[in-house]
Curated annotation (Swiss-Prot):
It comes from Pseudomonas aeruginosa (strain LESB58). It is an enzyme of class 6 (ligase). This is RNA 3'-terminal phosphate cyclase. Catalyzes the conversion of 3'-phosphate to a 2',3'-cyclic phosphodiester at the end of RNA. The mechanism of action of the enzyme occurs in 3 steps: (A) adenylation of the enzyme by ATP; (B) transfer of adenylate to an RNA-N3'P to produce RNA-N3'PP5'A; (C) and attack of the adjacent 2'-hydroxyl on the 3'-phosphorus in the diester linkage to produce the cyclic end product. The biological role of this enzyme is unknown but it is likely to function in some aspects of cellular RNA processing. GO terms for biological process: RNA processing.
Length: 341
């Protein structure tokens, strides 16, 4: 694979461009330069979560890095050889552990031995996939594609306190293609209201609204109290296990937002996905594109194309010899198809 310098404009997207570019630079060996990082955001440049991802990526592949500073709007990253090992990274805030781990996994799956990665920060952050999504929805699909990863949620961490912790065990693997046309029949459903230092009636009201909107039984709805020291925090998670996929939807309690409104948000997400008949919801689609591209082929259906998916597609096609196509479905939605370029 060529080792030409890849130059990207980071102004058109947020941290997604940075994370995908780091993953691809590590796995392909191609040096990277990003300008205007998060240029259109209210707080442009690298935040703590992004900086942790950069420094972690650099440690794993012995990269030469310029611009790895808080607030930096330009980054140069020249990767070396990927090294298996026992790693620990602390974000130092409630920044997302999930997003940092997703940045590192493709490289560690290409390493020369087994690795352990411990990441501390936010495990349940409204601006990122919760750890439950990684464990229950995303990683099982990667495992079907050949990835060998085990993930433990050691401690929950909510915004703004953080303090959560994930532990991943990663073994070298070879990617293989995956096709996801539809979810298949629903097999199991579960709603969980997580409460850490939050009154129990908040979760009870959330679960009652889930019953009203979705008709889920008492056995399918669960109140889960976490240690107060892990809070304050509240998340409502819906999990739908189907024949071919497990879908996870999440909404977070926030000041000024009623418990009923939180439940409405997550129920609306789930209903929209179920009615679409597509395999991957919008957020899962964002996260599937890169591993499928690394496999060199694959396809999935999704109800709509997010801005994240569109910008991610452009970054991937700069690094890898793949073509990512979009086919409109007759009943609505899209089929994303990855083929060799």
């Amino acid at each position: 694979m060529r080792k030409d310098l890849i130059e990207l404009d980071g102004s058109e997207g947020g941290g997604q461009i940075l994370r995908s570019a780091l993953s691809l630079s590590m796995t392909s060996g191609q040096p990277l330069r990003i300008r205007n990082i998060r240029g259109r955001r209210s707080r442009p440049g690298l935040l703590r979560q992004h900086l942790t991802a950069v420094r972690a990526a650099a440690e794993i592949c012995a990269a030469e890095v310029e611009g790895a500073e808080l607030g930096s709007r330009e980054l140069a990253f020249r990767p070396g050889a990927i090294r298996a090992g026992d790693y620990a990274f602390a974000i130092g805030s409630a920044g997302s552990c999930s997003l940092v781990l997703q940045t590192l996994l493709p490289a560690l799956l290409a390493a020369n031995g087994e690795s352990r990665v411990r990441i501390s920060g936010g495990t349940h952050n409204p601006l990122a996939p919760p750890a439950d999504f990684l464990r229950d929805s995303w990683l099982p699909l990667l495992q079907r594609m050949g990835a060998e990863v085990d993930l433990e949620l050691l401690r929950h961490g909510f915004v703004p306190a953080g303090g959560g912790e994930l532990l991943a065990r990663v073994r070298p693997a070879r990617w293989r293609p995956l096709q996801l046309e539809h979810p298949g029949a629903a097999l199991r459903r579960q709603a969980r209201a997580l409460l850490a230092g939050i009154p129990g009636h908040v979760g009870e009201r959330e679960l009652e609204r889930v019953r009203q909107r979705l008709g889920w039984s008492d056995e399918e709805r669960q109140l889960e109290f976490l240690a107060e020291v892990q809070g304050p925090g509240n998340a409502l998670l819906l999990r739908i296990d189907c024949e071919h996929i497990c879908a996870t939807f999440c909404a977070f309690g926030q000041a000024g937002v009623s418990a009923e409104r939180v439940a409405e948000q997550v129920a609306t997400q789930a209903i929209g996905w179920m009615e679409s008949g597509c395999a991957a919801d919008e957020h899962l689609a964002d996260q599937l594109l890169l591993p499928m591209a690394l496999a060199g082929a694959g396809s999935f259906t999704t109800p709509r194309l997010s801005a994240h998916l569109q910008s991610n597609r452009r970054v991937i096609e700069r690094f890898l010899p793949v073509r990512i196509g979009d086919q409109a479905l007759d009943g609505g939605g899209h089929r994303i198809v990855i083929t060799s370029a």
